Amino acid sequence: MAREIREIPPATERLLAEHDLVAAVADRIRKAEPRVVVISGRGSSGNVGTFLRYLFETRAGLLVSTSAPSVVTTYRQSLDMRDAVFIVISQSGRCPDLVMGARSARKSGALTIAIVNDVTSPVALACELTLPVGAGLEHAVAATKSVVLSMVISGQLIAALTSDHALREKIKQLPQRFSHALTCDWSAWRQLRSSACRVRNWARVWIGTGARDRA
């Protein structure tokens, strides 16, 4: 995981060089004139989706909804997704429910976009457009590198969609800022985190939730 984190600055620099692709996807969104954006993702990719939701709503003024894959996978219900943009975020691009959701959204009239690490994955192939994050092979379960790069390309997309020059310039500084973060002394933070964990554990014992959490 530490090695993959150290790979983030150069990977971000490579990602920022793909501005033409991001601009083309932003142009397709603009031409689609969507009424709503639907975002699909699980785990850490779902957290990236929350980040992208705030960008869409605060920067572009577009309403965003979170996808519920079980509507398609369990209840077998298709939705009217005309005038919608459907964005699926996935590191592996192989979760069956995300693939089914993307296929259903595309069939139902949405402009479908995959923010994905593996461009040959089923999720990428199910979508009309793909934004590759270029994280490469990851071994750490946390997938920190692809999560960070997915957030970076999310920022790029919104900057291009809204023609936000100030945001674009801030994003250009990220490789340098990430590199600087790797040189910082994080020992004080580790001590604070350790103390916070102890306080949390004692709080669980005090209010009686510890045994329940372990059950």
Features from the language model and the residues they span:
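Acidic catalytic cores of enzymes that act on phosphate-bearing nucleotides/polynucleotides
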Residues: 61, 196-215
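Generic recognition of flexible, low-complexity loop/linker segments
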Residues: 25-27, 75, 188-191
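An N-terminal, well-structured beta->alpha segment
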Residues: 1-35, 183
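Alpha-helix boundary recognition
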Residues: 6, 30, 57, 193-194
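Short, surface-exposed connector motifs at secondary-structure boundaries
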Residues: 33-37, 195-200
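Glycine-rich phosphate-binding loops that contact phosphosugars or nucleotide phosphates
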Residues: 21-22, 30-174, 180
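Active-site/ligand-binding-proximal alpha/beta "capping" segment
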Residues: 171-194
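Short, glycine/acidic-enriched capping/hinge loops at junctions between secondary-structure elements
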Residues: 16-17, 48-52, 213-215
